[in-house]
A protein has these predicted regions:
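N-terminal interaction/assembly modules
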Residues: 1-122, 126-153
């Protein structure tokens, strides 16, 4: 595993952990998403600065794009409203959709595979299939130009 790949994988895990926590206690009372991130035990235990910065970039990007990401997830999760999707799966879907749509340097296949790895680690037995189905449909539409962005599969 290359150093960049390992850093990004660990960064995704860290971003996922904080994003998942935010699904229970969203920013409120003067606490910004960034402040919560900086105070998160998972972040304060981490010593690798590049990893912390990458996870922070992901989290803040996801948080600022959450409405659009939820619209995309809702469009591709047939018969599943956002409110019905389990918090683990929703956090993984938001993270992966963000990478698929906004991170030009992450190939579509890599974004999907990394989401499946998160689902294997944190989800239940059905998580990976559910996540793969949604993300594969999103990636196909990105690949065919429906999202007005250009990426490699």
């Amino acid at each position: 595993m290359s150093q960049t790949k390992g850093l990004r994988r660990k960064g995704r895990v860290l971003a996922f952990q904080v994003l998942y926590g935010l699904s229970f206690v969203p920013p409120h009372g003067g606490w910004s998403c960034e402040r919560i991130y900086n105070q998160s035990p998972a972040v304060t235990r981490e010593t690798e600065e590049d990893l912390i910065l990458y996870a922070r970039e992901l989290l803040l990007g996801i948080w600022s794009s959450q409405e659009e990401l939820d619209e995309v997830i809702g469009r591709y999760s047939k018969h599943w409203k956002i409110e019905r999707i389990a918090k683990v799966e929703l956090a993984i879907l938001r993270l992966a959709a963000y990478e698929l749509i906004y991170k030009a340097d992450i190939p579509l296949k890599v974004g999907i595979n990394e989401a499946i790895e998160l689902a294997k680690k944190f989800g239940d037995g059905n998580s990976r299939n559910f996540i793969n189905g949604i993300l594969d449909a999103v990636a196909r539409d990105i690949d065919t130009g429906k999202f007005k962005i250009t990426k490699k599969f």
